[in-house]
Amino acid sequence: MSSTQFNKGPSYGLSAEVKNRLLSKYDPQKEAELRSWIEGLTGLSIGPDFQKGLKDGVILCTLMNKLQPGSVPKINRSMQNWHQLENLSNFIKAMVSYGMNPVDLFEANDLFESGNMTQVQVSLLALAGKAKTKGLQSGVDIGVKYSEKQERNFDDATMKAGQCVIGLQMGTNKCASQSGMTAYGTRRHLYDPKNHILPPMDHCTISLQMGTNKCASQVGMTAPGTRRHIYDTKLGTDKCDNSSMSLQMGYTQGANQSGQVFGLGRQIYDPKYCPQGSAADGAPAGDGQGEAPEYLAYCQEEAGY
């Protein structure tokens, strides 16, 4: 089985766009630094093509044995594809045991099929940084040294004192003050004498936030509990029947409380203002002989008041 059977065909469309974007992030300068670092530690030559020189996994496994002896016990030097892929898998496992972060690792096909050489470059740079953090000295300054943990132990008194400190993320309270604030639980006044605002005369004063009552008046309003008349004779309302609704519902200029008795039930009409009609209206004008008993009893009750 030849290695060409593992190679992919040309990419088109979105796949080609993604591949080109990954290739654009590849740094040739970092490749030269990695080449010098790997060849300096292993003593092996990678060759002119960086990908083809590392795809068999022999140089990478040798590099891991230099960084951590015995991490790759067996290195396959066969030209078979599965042996080369096995070397790459052993190298990735050795990087995990060396302390590499999973996000910094690459897959075997990324290097073997040249699928994502940018990720391979990132992984090797992270490996160089991890080796520098562990104190490896090499002639090539490559990789970033990781910072070490700086743990601090505080006693209980210090931890409790820190709970009273306002963090800088919350702002500052240097200029904060409660000067002039009323004590908690006291009444809140609607005026301030320092601002030359007139104090309210009594508890019935309506503040400006509620509007104004300068034009409000209760002139002509009936007392609570009294009877409501359907019409008002002073306004010239026609006396059609006992179910007619007059303008009293929206107009009170001519209303008065003369002749009203408080505490009585509310009647639909008042016989003093709603007579039974005249002879001209088609009704017989009598002296009350033909009235209904209920109406006569009501008239006697009204006359008693």
From Swiss-Prot:
Belongs to the calponin family. The modification Phosphoserine is found at residue 138. Residues 28-132 form the Calponin-homology (CH) domain. GO terms for cellular component: stress fiber. The keyword Acetylation applies. SMART domains: CH. This is Calponin-2. PROSITE patterns: CALPONIN_1, CALPONIN_2, CH. Keywords: Acetylation, Actin-binding, Calmodulin-binding, Phosphoprotein, Repeat. The keyword Transmembrane does not apply. It comes from Mus musculus. One of its GO terms (molecular function) is calmodulin binding. Calponin-like repeats lie at residues 166-191, 206-231, 245-269. One of its GO terms (biological process) is regulation of actin filament-based process. Coiled coil: none annotated.
